[in-house]
C-alpha cells in the first residue's frame, strides 16, 4: 500500500501545479486583453485624428471657395463641388468607422475587466 502522507504530499503538489497553471493562463489572458485595449485605443485616436484632418480640409476648402476661388467660380464649380462631396463622403465614412472603433474599444475594455476578474479568482483560490 501507498504511504498516506506521501500520497497527500503528491496530491498537494499536483493541486499546486494546477493552481499555478490556472494563474499563468489567467495572467496570459489578461495581458492579451490589455494589449487589445491598447490597440483599440490607438485605433480610436488615429480615427479621431483623421476626422480632425478631414474637417480641417473641408474648412480650408470652404475658405478657399469664398476667397481664392470666388473670381473663377464659374469654371471651378464642378471641381469644387466634386472635391467638397468627396471630403464629405470621407468624413462620413470616417465618422462611422470611429463609431465602430469606439464600440470595439468598449468591448475590449469589457473583456479586459473580465480577464482581470478571472485573474483575481485564479490567484485567490
Regions found by a protein language model. Give the residues of each.
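Charge-rich amphipathic alpha-helical interaction elements
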Residues: 1-125
Amino acid at each position: 500500500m501507498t504511504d498516506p502522507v506521501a500520497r497527500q504530499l503528491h496530491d498537494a503538489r499536483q493541486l499546486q501545479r494546477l493552481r499555478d497553471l490556472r494563474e499563468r493562463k489567467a495572467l496570459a489572458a489578461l495581458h492579451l486583453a490589455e494589449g487589445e485595449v491598447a490597440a483599440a485605443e490607438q485605433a480610436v485616436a488615429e480615427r479621431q485624428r483623421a476626422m480632425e484632418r478631414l474637417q480641417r480640409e473641408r474648412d480650408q476648402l470652404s475658405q478657399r471657395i469664398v476667397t481664392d476661388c470666388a473670381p473663377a467660380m464659374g469654371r471651378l464649380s464642378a471641381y469644387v463641388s466634386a472635391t467638397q462631396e468627396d471630403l464629405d463622403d470621407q468624413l462620413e465614412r470616417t465618422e462611422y468607422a470611429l463609431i465602430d472603433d469606439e464600440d470595439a474599444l468598449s468591448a475590449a475594455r469589457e473583456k479586459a475587466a473580465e480577464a482581470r476578474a478571472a485573474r483575481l479568482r485564479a490567484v485567490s483560490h
